[in-house]
Amino acid sequence: MRNAPTVYPGLMVPAMILVISTIIAGCSKNDDPDESEPQTKSVASCEGCHTNYAHLQEVYTPDTAAPAGGCGGEAPHYEPYDRVRMDGDGYEAFKQSSHYEIGCTGCHNGTDNTADKELAHSGDFISHPSVMAAEKCASCHQEIVDNFVTSLHNGTGQKRKVAIRSGFDGPEDFDQLPPHQIEGYNANCATCHAGCGECHVVRPPIGGGGLIDRHNFKKTPDMLNVCVTCHTSRGGHAYLGVAAGTQPDVHLTALDYTCLDCHDAGEMHGDGQPVEQRYAYSKLPECENCHTDLKSKNNYHSIHVEDFNCQVCHSQDYNNCGSCHIHGDGARIPSYLDFKIAGNPIPDVVPDFDLTLVRRTLAAPDNWEVYGVEYTNFDALPTYNYTTPHNILKWTERTDVGNGKACSDNCHIRNEGGALINKELYLFQEDLLEWEQSASSGITVDGKLPESWFEEK
């Protein structure tokens, strides 16, 4: 324990006089602004307005539409004045940053030093500067901006599929789509595809938008308020163990990992090289980065580690939904838990696996009906994607067999009196809806499993 300070009585009176003198001086007029109490900035300035909560409530403009919709559903609501408010610890941290030194109009354009709200936000004002990253961010972050053009967070993967199903070659042709279809994509599908700001400064639109920490720039995005806000129904839903009967991912419960422990900044920002889809990306994390010598770990691995992806054994049931009616009815196949093993949909990208987990996508022939657009080549891609659910456990319904049972008891199909046990784990042609069959029949397991599995014992 630290020793108490020694008190010297002879010094008490002078000290008291000094304190009293200081108090008196503090009550007198002080012409030195550096020594005075902090002053409220004038509302006739960007910073003064956005740090004056009462004034924001007086001058705000009510919303005329929700900030986002799309497949994520209705976004949570934050009042307009709460979305742009700057105060508290976040604002104080922002003031200590190099971004603060740039000044409000340095990033947002517009006009400073005016109480006229319309004038302040007039002309070339931009609410989200990172949509013009080449102009606003590149002077300090040139490499990141250059690489981000091909980042999956910039939407290249989804744009690729829309373009291919529309009869084009890939994401580079996206701008050739009808303008109203592009408008619909931006208003719906793109609400989760992010620029710099949506990870580092503001909530993604699907999370309600607005400053996430009073304009503080977060170098490391917050997992719940940023990552899971977009990756809700498929990523966060699984990783946090939200669904009934599921458990959180072991990487969360045992290691307290956040998304950035596996998916680092290099992966998020991109490397400038275009890829067909996310599993072709060079910086994608692999289980083997941490789990070495997998083949020799146990009998399960020695038999199957080269046959299918790790999630076939170690994933729990995961969320699916499908048939999105964009800007209309939304997902007409509502979310449901499922587990499907199918033929590898991307053998050119992940050539090592014959069987993989797959997840139903939102694709449907009439995705763009509201916008008067029909796909011309819908069958070019399957309606189920290769998937790696983030709900890993060592012991799952597939791996945790009963005492005395064969290790394959919960995963191989077997015929017991005409009943095919475990058949529901696999994607068969009969599982496809009529409009899915032509696009997805190539990845079903029909004719690809051992005949002995179907013979009655």
Language-model region placement:
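C-type cytochrome heme-c attachment and multiheme electron-transfer modules
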Residues: 22, 27-206, 216-457
